[in-house]
Amino acid sequence: MVAREVIFDMEADNLLDNITKIHCLSYRYVDTPNEVTTLTDYSDIKGFIVDGPCEDAVLIGHNIIGYDLPAIDKILGVTTTCKTIDTLPLSWYLNHGRSVHGLDSYGEDFGVL
């Protein structure tokens, strides 16, 4: 079975050391780009992480290993068994001459911000 790719991002109230609240988690499957789901209820976010698309999916996001997934574990006490692809270290590796690797910087470069 070919794994489905799920792009996700979450927003919270602070950096990891001081986080107290997850505002939302949004995701979409790569093969259905016009269908974005946003979760704000903690039980729904837990369900996505624990029981969600993981059996047949790869979670993809920017800094998910360094921030999103640890933040979810810190606030909700759950971890994922999904395979993950973190685009931040990929950016460091593929664009080693770039001084900034944040999504805002890429958004400016591509004219979407």
State the predicted function of each range.
Residues 2-8, 16-17, 22-113:
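Conserved DEDDh/DEDDy metal-dependent 3′-5′ exonuclease domain
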Residues 13:
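Conserved Rossmann-like nucleotide-cofactor binding loop
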